[in-house]
Amino acid sequence: MKFIKTSTGDSYSNAFLSSFAEDTRIGHGIASQEDARLLQEDLKQVYLWAEQNNMRFNSIKFELLRYGKNSNLKDSTEYVSNTGEIINAKESVKDLGVTMSSNANFKEHIGKVIDTVKELTAWILRSFRSRSPILMMQLWKSIVIPRLDYCSQLWNPHYVGQIQELEQLQRYFVKRIAGYQDMDYHTALKRLGLYSLQRRRERYQVIYLWSIIEGKVPNIPATNNTDLIKVHTSIESRNGRTIYIQPLKTGRYQTLRFNSLPFHGARLFNAMSKNVRNATQLSKDAFKNILDMSLKLIPDTPLLCSTT
């Protein structure tokens, strides 16, 4: 079933709705029992829409993911499916290929990415005798890199251990290329024309935020029905275009937010050179070229494990 009802109608003013392919999502920030009631009302409106269009949701596939530290509110609120069954909350949910956990980190997803890349790397090394740089780079870029890049703007880790573990995947592969076995990792990356994986993830964050402020992709919605990504200073200003960074208090969840795309990505964007930040009315490929020229001037020194 494909959900094609837009979220701009009055019937769904309490929550946000989104749809992709056969998946439909409905969400609401819950701060009280009244918020929970409003979310259930919006769920009923979605069920009613499906019934009026001779369609129905599969209640078996309903998934509920809760974020936040208010355990009392979590335990005292329930939501029901179109069949009247209680929707059970889950510790993690896979959405469009990304595993999201109720503790608001991506440890489980990163672990799955690492396991998948290790399997693909082992398959490549078993299946191909040649270790020539050209062949190995074609295999790495076409088979493995897409798994490491997919949605990395969202799950980009900030824990040193996770950054090192991910970087070790590429380091291991580079060491298996003919002529690069004993070469320093950073030197090998330059000769092979590769970025470190950490640099790749940061690069994609900058590209995505540029796409948002250029209007090429939708903005990130905030809880007060406003856009989360906002331009702080314009191109005409002395320092060039920058993104506004909201102040945050200390705490566990604030730390996670501090390292998320709207905050960490915004700091990266603001740290770029003025010609990168002021690039406008360009194609994405043209912006990537400008960004890459600027990144060449910044040392690419990722965190590495001590073992090979």
Language-model segments: what does each one mean?
Residues A31-L39, A104-V113, S127-Q138, N156-L166, ...:
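Conserved, non-catalytic sequence blocks in retroelement Pol enzymes and Pol-derived host proteins
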Residues T24-E51, P157:
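Catalytic palm subdomain of template-directed nucleic-acid polymerases
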Residues V160-T308:
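Short linear motifs embedded in intrinsically disordered, charge-biased segments
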Residues G84-L154:
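Basic, alpha-helical interaction scaffolds
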Residues M1-F3, L39-D42, V113, L120, ...:
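Hydrophobic alpha-helical membrane-association signature
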Residues M1-G27:
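Active-site palm subdomain of RNA-directed nucleic acid polymerases
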Residues E22-T24, A50, L64, G97, ...:
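Mobile genetic element proteins and their domesticated derivatives, centered on retroelements
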Residues E41, R56-S92:
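Short, conserved micro-motifs composed of acidic
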